Amino acid sequence: MRTGKLTATVTAGVTAALTALAVAGCSGGGTPQRGESGRSPSAAPTPTWDPVQGPPRTVPAVQKFSAADGRGWRPGKQARVVVPAGEKSPVADEAERFARELGGLRTVWGKQTVRPGDVELKLSDDGAGRADNAPVYDTADEAYTVTARGTRLTLTAPTDAGIFNATRTVLQSVRASGGVPEGTIEDRPDRAQRGFMLDIARKHFDARWIEDRIRDLAGLKLNQLQLHFSDDQAFRIESEKHPEIVSADHLTKDQVRHLVEVARGLHVTVIPEIDSPGHLGAVLKAHPDLQLRSADGRTERGAMDISQPGAAEIVDDLLREFAPLFPGKHWHLGGDEYRALADRAPAENYPQLARAAREKYGDGATIEDLATGWLNDRDKTVRAAGAQHVEAWNDGYFPDTDVEPDPHRTVAYWTGKEIGAREPAEYLRENRKVVNLNDEYLYYVLGEPNNMPYPTGERIYKQWTPGVLRGTQPVPESSSGPDRVLGARFAVWCDLAGEQTQQQVADGIRMPLRALAQKVWDRREPALSWEDFKKLANQV
């Protein structure tokens, strides 16, 4: 897949590096060409630039750098981006993007002599035969090596996602240091899932703003964007099956397709979330007959009466409609804060739910069983539509139910403050996979309601790790490895939507996202102080 719109124009750091090389007499002239194939390379002068000082300076930091004697590599206008596998290689789009980001370098295709100053992009043997922008399955798929030797640069990875990560490292190193120091970078992420969750239901964000966030995520090697687009306040994506539920301010499906395609080209997966059986106020406004009512006639905002067959029908309609729009194989089912289960006497106050539970699951079944079965059924719906990785919020899992939650569903752990909330260690003992969205550190809630101050990058950088799932204390290290706690997302919730503009949100989350990127990529204690990390983040 070739993305027509590339990530950015030349940065100030790259421009400065090219200017310095021109002064040194190494740049050459002429208009950069798109590419060439099968030509014999003309002689290129050996660059005489000052050695690049190491180690590489990037956000996140690289896992390993082995220094060597030499000048390193700097971008020059006579340099080329070389793709030995040719123009149809899965890394062809990475090469073209990278060449433009480096100031309009020439891309060349096919096996040939790599000249001084050139950059070579190639897949390792185990990457042969992979489709372009194919999904990655573990952190090994995102690994890469960058070698600066003899004024040449070689980027090697098993996948195009790994090559993309390598190009981000090179660009950041150029911005911070003017180039890449002599030696070898060996790098891969600690956690497979690294991302950002955005509540577009409570607050409308325009498509361009969301696209800018995707590009920012990709530059930090964050690889997920979760879109929470349905809630009590609004339903924010066009629906052909149920246009009656869609809010006036919304994204069209074409806009979403564009966002998903941009994200895919930048190796970011967009994860859709239609929350149920709670947080459905926008749907219920158009379908009040499906609203949950207590025995005394009280309506519960956003809560669907899941004893009614029509409830499952409309939610499954929506899940099936939107599945083709989000082909990234991930789905979030919500499942949190169902009002009936926040009640001290749910069976007494919602007898229709208690009755439905017994009818479906037997005499001893409870409303918790009914809610668990509801999520299991929605899980089956999205898996039948192609989803492979399904998750739900932690308060959508209940202890001691007769109905077991689908064992393959991931727990998105956000809080221990809800009624009946369980310790994260319980899910890990059940051998469940967990993603960290700890509201103590990773929740940016507009207006700071309920004593939730805006999180800071400094606090994340200094105190939080992927194992800190609830409050401020980590779960045991033996149960919080990358195979158990898959990663983390920083979340923006828009409870008081008018409290910040889109620009204020972008400014407010900038450093928290950079701190998160560091902590999910590299499990080691950060080498830089917070002040030095901030300075570096502003450079790269």
Mark where each language-model region is.
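Feature activates predominantly on carbohydrate-active enzymes
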Residues: T139-A312, R320-H330, P346, L496
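Structural preference for beta-strand elements that scaffold enzyme active sites
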Residues: Q193-M197, Q224-Q226, H267-I271, H330-H332, ...
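Active-site beta-loop-alpha junctions enriched in small/polar residues
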Residues: A201, S230-A234, E273-H279, D336-A340, ...
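Conserved, mostly hydrophobic/aromatic
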Residues: V81, T159, F196, L217, ...
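Flexible, acidic glycine-rich loops studded with aromatic residues
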Residues: T107, V390-D395, D402-V540
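Active-site neighborhood of glycoside hydrolase catalytic domains
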Residues: R301-H408, W414, I419-P424
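Acidic, contiguous N-terminal accessory segments
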Residues: R2-T9, G13-A20, C26-P158, T169-V170, ...
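A structural motif corresponding to the C-terminal end of an alpha-helix
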Residues: Q255-V270, F322-P327, W374-H389, S478-V485
